[in-house]
A protein has these predicted regions:
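Conserved small/polar residues in nucleotide/adenosyl-binding loops
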Residues: 1-5
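ATPase catalytic-site recognition across NTP-hydrolyzing enzymes
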Residues: 11-75
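Non-catalytic, well-ordered alpha-helical scaffold segments
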Residues: 31, 35, 175, 203-206
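Acidic, glycine-rich loop-and-beta core segments that form the ion-binding/anion-interacting portion
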Residues: 61-97
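Anionic group-transfer/hydrolysis microenvironments
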Residues: 73-75, 101, 130, 209
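Mg2+-dependent endonuclease catalytic cores in nucleic-acid-processing enzymes, primarily RNase H-like
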Residues: 84, 91-200, 219-220
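Charge-patterned, long linear interaction tracts outside catalytic cores
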Residues: 199-224
Length: 224
């Protein structure tokens, strides 16, 4: 309740960190501020990711990106293997999708070879920890692969962190991630009401993205 009516609450009750966070969000993303702190509905109500900008990301932009995060969601068939490479603009709390590799029926050797041929062994890759052998395979193949840290509520925690960020995506560069990010919606009951929780389907690139930022999320918390 305080978050949605915080201007009516004495500042000393909320604390300066809360006020600073609200004002920071107001400055960098007014629409997110209005939704989260003022209670103004400004989305379609069903989309999980509301702060998405679809546009061309140029080679010149990418050349200047130096805070790179990479993640892997293991898969075979019918579930896809998904690798994503993104950039995080900390000051503006914005994620940019740079590249992806989302495929079926590829061995660890084949996907590792793709990563190395693209030159993407320049940064660590945070992987789904559910397959420790695959993580070890990547390490043996010369990649800096690390297992994501998981715990109770880690999926919800990570998803909320991503939801608060703006996501910039170029359909030409990352068509699979584009489709997932822009169509991923909450489930609804028979009466059309939204069901809490995140559907575990059509979300392989999304899971890869969540793993990529695992260290940031766990280190700095949901409101980082």
């Amino acid at each position: 309740m305080y978050k949605r009516q915080y201007l009516d609450v004495p500042k000393e009750w909320l604390g300066q960190p809360f006020i600073d966070e609200a004002e920071h969000l107001k400055e960098i993303r007014p629409e997110a501020y209005e939704h989260e702190y003022m209670g103004i509905a400004n989305g379609n109500g069903g989309a999980v990711f509301e702060y998405v900008e679809v546009r061309e990301i140029t080679d010149e932009e990418i050349a200047q990106m130096d805070r790179i995060y990479q993640g892997v969601d293991w898969g075979w068939y019918p579930d896809k293997y998904a690798f994503t490479r993104t950039y995080y603009d900390v000051a503006r709390e914005t994620i940019y999708f740079i590249d992806e590799h989302c495929v079926n029926k590829r061995s660890n050797e084949q996907t590792a070879d793709w990563i190395k041929k693209k030159g993407y062994n320049d940064y660590a890759i945070i992987c789904d920890s559910a397959e420790p052998k695959s993580v070890e395979d990547y390490r043996n193949l010369g990649l800096v692969a690390q297992a994501a840290v998981k715990g109770p509520g880690s999926v919800e925690y990570g998803m909320k962190w991503l939801q608060r960020r703006k996501i910039v995506i170029d359909p030409r560069r990352t068509p699979y991630a584009y489709k997932e990010i822009t169509t991923y919606e909450y489930d609804r009951d028979k009466d059309g009401n939204i069901i809490s929780g995140y559907p575990d389907r059509d979300n392989h690139a999304i899971d890869s993205l969540r793993y990529a930022y695992n260290r940031v999320i766990m280190r700095r918390g949901e409101n980082a």
